[in-house]
Amino acid sequence: MENINSRLIKEFAITMEQAESVIQLLDEGNTVPFIARYRKERTGGLDDIILRNFTERLIYLRNLEERKADVIRLIGEQEKLTEEIEKSINKSETLTEIEDIYRPYKPKKRTRAIIAIEKGLKPLAETIFSGGFKGDINDYAQGFVCEDKLVSNALDALAGAGDIISEMISDEADYRKWIRGQVHNFGSVETKGSSEDTTPFEMYYEYKEGIKTIPPHRILAINRGEKSKILSVKIKADNDKIIDYLRNKCLKGNSETDKFIELSIIDSVKRLIFPSIEREIRSELTEKGEIGAIDIFKANLKALLMQSPIKGKVVLGFDPGFRTGCKIAVLDDTGKVLDIATVYATAGSQDGVKKSIAIIKDLVIKHNVEVVSLGNGTASRESEEILAQIITELKQECSRDLYYVIVSEAGASVYSASELASKEYPDIDVSIRGAISIGRRLQDPLVELVKIDPKAIGVGQYQHDVAPKKLDESLKGVVEDCVNAVGVDLNIATPALLAYISGINAAIAQNIVAYREENGKFKARKELLKVKRLGAKAYEQCAGFLRVMESNEFLDNTSIHPESYNATKKLLDFLNYTKEDLKSLNFKDMDERIKDINFNELALKLETGAPTLRDIIKEIKKPGRDPREELPKPILKTGVVQMKDLKPGMKLMGTVRNVSDFGAFVDIGVHQDGLVHISQLSDKFVKHPLDVVSVGDIVEVSVIEVDEKRKRISLSMKN
């Protein structure tokens, strides 16, 4: 365990105390959101991202220690374990190193070497490989001829001995480690196209890039091309250098045996070592590609979920379509459905379009709609033109302001047909549910998007080339962190949302809703303890992330944990706040009252930690604050810009819709996202686009080039 802790300290640049505390907290069953938010004193303020990476690494290192113990036991059972082997295993830092050491002792299928050993040729191989043999090698090999064992002559015996030596060289852990490093550091990935046709993989038809430097997105693109049988892929390395290295290690200066050993070296490299290391390198590259894709997906998903909500506005959700019509849902400022309609605004006769416009205008006026949330799918461009016309007419006819925002409708159709949607809207047609989802995504992106499988949200890069289980686990962690960072209203939250709260699983989430339906709204956080299967530990983990607006205890509607209520009340008393101040939540002058306070001394006096005290003060100054409100709001539009209107040099405001390894895709309102290539993101060097932009960012861009035929827009964020 000490070894694990030491490695974690180095890798995460933390203290031994931090490492031990985090491990203990995790082993006690505490969740990452709970530890990040309410155990800052013990972790030294490590955030949720570091804690998740720490947890993942801890699991890997523990598995590593288990494998070490297994390999030591397995070699010991063969009575071949030496002190040196055990020491080498314990020093290993990766599973690959352990498997290299175990390789000679691992049960094998019947290889050429094993067949030769069965023929009694191992002593011949060992004698030759030792370099101590004197005399004629062919005469010596004659002594191993045995017709019964299918060793007909000296050449057969030497061929079998060569196979054994080849495998002995291949199984040597130190040799493999050096060769693997050589291939990794100086080798390359080379690809060739098997077709002359134009395909998405055209750039890889004659391609070469260093193993060490190839970026994740190219690895996955090459893998996809290979899987489609459009590309052939090889790992290339300097085999002559590898053979020279093995010559220096294996040749003994014996002219009689060295020629023979050299043939075994060449055979070992070409037949055993290189193909095996090529498979390992390809596997490592795929893992690198998957990690890169998952990291980008996580960052994009987090930014999307944490987009600033548009609160307190009546919204019209607009799901565009042609043949089946456009689906409309009007939502009040809490997301409740006020009205629904189907209009044929983008297809059909002029009379039909006029009727559709009239219906939409009536809905806007009747329900005092302020913003339209327009889905970006089929018929979105045509629908946008209709909306622009409606906005102009409403302004002229009754001086009414109306805006629209184009919203990604990715996953809306999946949600519409889901069991969850059926439970939420049993009496509303499946086709209308998509419009409700599109409208609610504008009102509260987080609450609405957690209902959808993250993979269906459409912000991934090569997500279909990543192991599903690995991707699911990573994305679930992102959603959990976002939901807990914002907090949830206990009395209106759906089971889908509650299930992401720290300490609550799907079953407990259903029990909470069942309790609420049977007993009415929760009156206090502590009432959670009456919910079936929600015990003291689950309550500790979840309470701080659940808000109860109806509670008489105002702290129940903050992110302050119940365990800190006493400290909070002592603080307010210390700062001379009255009961009237508490009732009216009048803490505007808090900064003035605490400006001369020594936080560490006050924390001791209140029997809490300084980080917790700072969090308490931050929350009291703005009870129930939503961290998303500090982020930029979506761009509200009133008119249409078309691709043909764009000219090089034109400056526009846009919203980042997706980020990849090679750049960012920005929505500038023309139904075709423009690409800001990584080289155009800044005047300074940019290592990765995520260092500069995130999904949802509002950015100023200038147009570099427009290709209407290929529907490509090149943008720049340089000054």
Q: Where does each model-flagged region fall?
A:
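Helical mechanochemical/support elements of P-loop NTPase systems and associated helical scaffolds
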Residues: I4, Q18, E28-F34, D47-N53, ...
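Structured core elements
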Residues: F34, S232-K234, V314-G317, K327-V330, ...
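Duplex nucleic acid-engaging cores and interfaces of nucleic-acid transaction enzymes
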Residues: I50-N53, Y60, L64-G317, R323-D427, ...
